[in-house]
Structure formats: structure tokens, C-alpha cells
Swiss-Prot record:
Alphabetic keyword roster: Cell membrane, Membrane, Transmembrane, Transmembrane helix
GO cellular component: plasma membrane
Intrachain disulfide bonds: none
Superkingdom of source: Bacteria
Transmembrane segments: 2-22, 34-54, 64-84, 108-128
Name of the protein in question: Uncharacterized protein TP_0070
Length: 128
């Protein structure tokens, strides 16, 4: 399904860009305050989670449905978990996400950004 392909690429790129570039800059919190809003975090987490589940069920151009889009699915799932953590922190609620995942937010952001670029360039490749 092509719409889920583009949704996966867009959400992985947005999550990767936010986690790697914007979180390292302190002035981005003042320039783009909506990026740190609870509603934005929840919407991006839900879209990323939906795209990850749909990519696992419906791969693009692969013969093995479970293994077809493994890397974008993993990137979308971890991005969903990280932004659910941001949502819980913004609402001052305890987060169900493990600290080890949150500690590696920047490398996971790089993984998500790389997954979106590679998935955009090499869509029919198996395991990507």
C-alpha cells in the first residue's frame, strides 16, 4: 500500500530530524514550541506506530510479508515509543518506556533518519 509507504517515510524522517537536529539545539525550543507540545508528540507517535504496524503487515514489493520492511518497521516502532515517552513527560505522568531506550534517543533518531532515506531510495529491496 503506497500511502503507508509514504507515511512511514515521512514519520521516520520527521522523528529522525527532531531527535538528531532539533533536540541538540537549545534555540529550537523557542523557535518551534509546538514540537515539544504533548499533542504533537501524541499525534506523531500514533502515526508512526500505525505506519510501523501497516508496514509489517503490508510490505512494498517484497515476497516475504513478515520480513519485507524490517528496518522501517523497527525505526517506526522505536520512534513511536520515544514520542510516547515525550507525551507522558509533557503531561507529567510516569512513562512506561524503559530508560535505556530514552538514553539512546539521538542514535535512534539517526537510525530513523537513515531508515527513511534508505527506504525512500530503495523501496522494493528485501529487508529494507
Amino acid at each position: 500500500m503506497l500511502p503507508f509507504y509514504f507515511l512511514s517515510v515521512a514519520t521516520n524522517a520527521a522523528i529522525g530530524f527532531i531527535l538528531t537536529v532539533l533536540d541538540s539545539q537549545e534555540e529550537s525550543a523557542h523557535d518551534c514550541p509546538f514540537l515539544y507540545d504533548a499533542t504533537f508528540s501524541l499525534v506523531l507517535a500514533l502515526l508512526s506506530g500505525i505506519a510501523a504496524v501497516c508496514k509489517c503487515v503490508n510490505p512494498i514489493g517484497a515476497q516475504l510479508p513478515v520480513l519485507g520492511d524490517l528496518i522501517p518497521t523497527l525505526a517506526g516502532g522505536t520512534g513511536c515509543a520515544l514520542f510516547l515517552h515525550r507525551y507522558c513527560v509533557a503531561l507529567s505522568k510516569p512513562s512506561p518506556i524503559p530508560r535505556t531506550l530514552v538514553q539512546y534517543a539521538k542514535p535512534l533518531g539517526l537510525f530513523s533518519l537513515a531508515a527513511s532515506i534508505l527506504h525512500l531510495l530503495f523501496a522494493p529491496t528485501l529487508f529494507l
